[in-house]
């Protein structure tokens, strides 16, 4: 749902200009850091508050509006989007969707301005796709919970001011019902951050382990004030995030296809541009068709969610198709570039590595398939 087309177009124009003029992906790839002036520019644009309601200082974008902005951000290194996207997405959505009023008032305004960043602490060394099997524990001790455990591959962990933490509070319930969601502030004694992970791609987007050792978290920090709701909160957060990541994949694919098209027009072999060869045209056409299909899926799912409809099947469909599509487009782009596509100077190999993560985080492609199929079976058996 687009509330005001003129306002949205002005925002999109600003974001596209920011991406085009200031977000140099080769710099962040070489330094593994996002410059402070770029972070300041993101704050000025309101990117840290995209999805946070206006009453808390954010822009309060609808899902459709958010998807369009994220597609624009997908035109450059995903590391830039990761810095604010984790905060406006999985980092804050648990508080926004299920938090108590005072929790929203305390944290959302600071997140909206970028004063603090938020991370989503769900994944563990032994609990990745099987998120319900997490082992991090939170034992009640008076007015506190004592948290022990390790979270792995946590995006923005080195920079986060708060963590949306999922921990097991009911040790008798080994399933999702034993999981509770907490807001844990970074300066809470007992929290330590591991060294930054050395990754295949997305340099500048930092992930690390978060270790909790007898970390005493006030009982008031339980999201929504009720135990046992953490897994439900996590799934709601991830459902929205799947549309977000699908939109990101569409944007990245559009950028790679544009680069491949321009290269194929300029590059000459056998006395003519390689764009005139039908086998190259087939790769270009297949990529365009798949991008169009993925974008249509994302926009449809976003509108459905804005209308208050159930998108528990559509969201994973978007994530599955769009991220797999993006991988195929990346591969074709490298192929069109030929040997140049394998050399760092041209940049397409960097995108090839960067987008590989899209099929892994916030639910692997295989998890999306399982969720889709289960929903289909459940619907058929009603």
Label each PLM-derived region with a short phrase.
Residues 1-80, 86, 98-103, 110-115, ...:
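Alpha-helical interface subdomain recognition
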Residues 46, 70-74, 167, 184-189, ...:
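Short Ser/Thr-interspersed hydrophobic loop/turn segments at strand-loop and sheet-helix junctions
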Residues 92-98:
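Flexible, glycine-rich active-site loops centered on histidine and acidic residues
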Residues 111, 126-129, 153-156, 172-173, ...:
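Short Gly/Pro-enriched turn/cap motifs at secondary-structure boundaries
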Residues 114-122, 166:
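A short, Trp-centered hydrophobic/proline-enriched beta-strand micro-motif
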Residues 133, 187-216:
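Flexible, small-/acidic-enriched active-site or ligand-binding loops
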Residues 144, 148-193:
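A short core secondary-structure module
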């Amino acid at each position: 749902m687009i509330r005001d087309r003129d306002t949205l177009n002005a925002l999109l124009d600003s974001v596209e200009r920011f991406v085009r003029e200031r977000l140099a992906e080769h710099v962040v790839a070489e330094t593994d850091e996002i410059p402070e002036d770029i972070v300041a520019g993101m704050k000025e644009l309101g990117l840290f508050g995209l999805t946070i309601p206006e009453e808390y200082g954010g822009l309060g974008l609808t899902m459709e509006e958010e998807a369009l902005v994220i597609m624009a951000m997908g035109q450059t290194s995903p590391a830039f989007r990761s810095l604010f996207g984790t905060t406006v997405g999985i980092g804050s959505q648990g508080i926004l969707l299920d938090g108590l009023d005072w929790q929203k008032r305390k944290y959302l305004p600071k997140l909206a301005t970028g004063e603090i960043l938020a991370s989503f602490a769900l994944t563990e060394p032994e609990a990745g796709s099987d998120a319900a099997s997490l082992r991090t524990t939170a034992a009640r001790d008076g007015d506190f919970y004592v948290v022990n455990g390790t979270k792995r591959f946590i995006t923005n962990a080195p920079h986060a001011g708060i963590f949306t933490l999922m921990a097991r509070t009911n040790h008798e319930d080994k399933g999702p019902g034993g999981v509770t969601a907490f807001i844990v502030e970074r300066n809470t004694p007992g929290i330590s951050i591991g060294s930054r992970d050395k990754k295949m791609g997305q340099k500048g987007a930092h992930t690390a382990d978060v270790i909790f050792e007898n970390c005493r978290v006030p009982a008031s920090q339980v999201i929504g004030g009720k135990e046992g709701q953490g897994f439900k909160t996590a799934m709601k957060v991830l459902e929205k995030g799947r549309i977000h990541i699908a939109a990101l994949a569409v944007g990245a694919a559009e950028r790679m296809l544009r680069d491949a098209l321009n290269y194929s027009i300029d590059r000459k072999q056998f006395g003519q541009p390689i764009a005139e060869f039908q086998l190259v045209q087939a790769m270009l056409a297949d990529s365009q068709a798949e991008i169009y299909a993925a974008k249509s899926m994302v926009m449809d799912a976003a509108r459905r969610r804005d209308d208050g409809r159930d998108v528990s099947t559509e969201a994973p469909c978007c994530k599955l198709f769009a991220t797999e599509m993006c991988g195929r487009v990346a591969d074709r782009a490298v192929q069109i570039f030929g040997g140049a596509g394998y050399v760092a100077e041209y940049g397409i190999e960097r995108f090839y590595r960067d987008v590989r993560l899209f099929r892994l985080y916030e639910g692997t492609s295989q998890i999306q398939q399982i969720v889709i199929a289960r929903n289909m079976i459940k619907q058929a058996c009603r």
